[in-house]
Amino acid sequence: MAYPFELGFQDATSPIMEELLHFHDHTLMIVFLISSLVLYIISLMLTTKLTHTSTMDAQEVETIWTILPAIILILIALPSLRILYMMDEINDPSLTVKTMGHQWYWSYEYTDYEDLNFDSYMIPTSDLSPGELRLLEVDNRVVLPMELPIRMLISSEDVLHSWAIPSLGLKTDAIPGRLNQATLTSTRPGLYYGQCSEICGSNHSFMPIVLELVPLKHFENWSSSML
């Protein structure tokens, strides 16, 4: 989860988020090199008295500043497209969970189980126990097995919402009348927090998401107790 004064991303907990962090570092390096080059050229222009007022044509320079940006864009686009295809790929999910957004709470349905569904509301600040997080705790957590591919089907009952878990690299819009899907795989157990990431009304800030990733055996025990 995020901490006060945090400068970087949250710790990656899924293969997709690991790829996104690598892509961020790759792109940031390219941006840093371009910015350094531009600042260097500007500093030279400000400190030298030499000018080329008689230059009418420079084919070599025009060729360089046409080809070089094209190469840079390709270096950014190729890894980006690779990650996009990885995020859309869903191979034989072990579990499917249907998520519906409401004003202002989430409801979940485990489609592989009969009558396993519940609503998830934010716990008011006045009801929090010591150590619990303000505006992030819910009365019913989404319990999922770790290290298994899980498909999330996401939609909305009323207005636009967005289901987002930053540490898993997930953000999928919940659109009325449309069923979007995303896949997640957690590499380690724990609690993972998210929030609605689409302004949806006066209580938009009060729609937290809490995933509890546990070993498969613990998940089976939990699902049996819920039925």
Swiss-Prot record:
Q: Which GO terms describe its biological process?
A: ATP synthesis coupled electron transport
Originating organism: Neotamias bulleri (Buller's chipmunk)
Give EC number(s), comma-separated.
7.1.1.9
Similarity section? Belongs to the cytochrome c oxidase subunit 2 family.
Q: Which residues lie on this side of the membrane: Mitochondrial matrix?
A: 46-59
Q: What membrane topology does the UniProt entry give?
A: Multi-pass membrane protein
The UniProt entry, under NCBIfam families, shows: CoxB
- Cofactor(s) this protein cannot do without: Cu cation
Domain of life from the UniProt record: Eukaryota
Which Gene Ontology molecular function entries are recorded, alphabetically? copper ion binding; cytochrome-c oxidase activity
Question: Which N-terminal stretch is annotated as signal sequence?
Answer: none
Q: What is this protein called?
A: Cytochrome c oxidase subunit 2
Q: Which gene encodes it?
A: MT-CO2
Identify the residues that bind Cu cation A1: 161, 196, 200, 207
Subcellular compartments: Mitochondrion inner membrane
Q: Which UniProt keywords apply?
A: Copper, Electron transport, Magnesium, Membrane, Metal-binding, Mitochondrion, Mitochondrion inner membrane, Respiratory chain, Translocase, Transmembrane, Transmembrane helix, Transport
Q: Name one GO cellular component term.
A: mitochondrial inner membrane
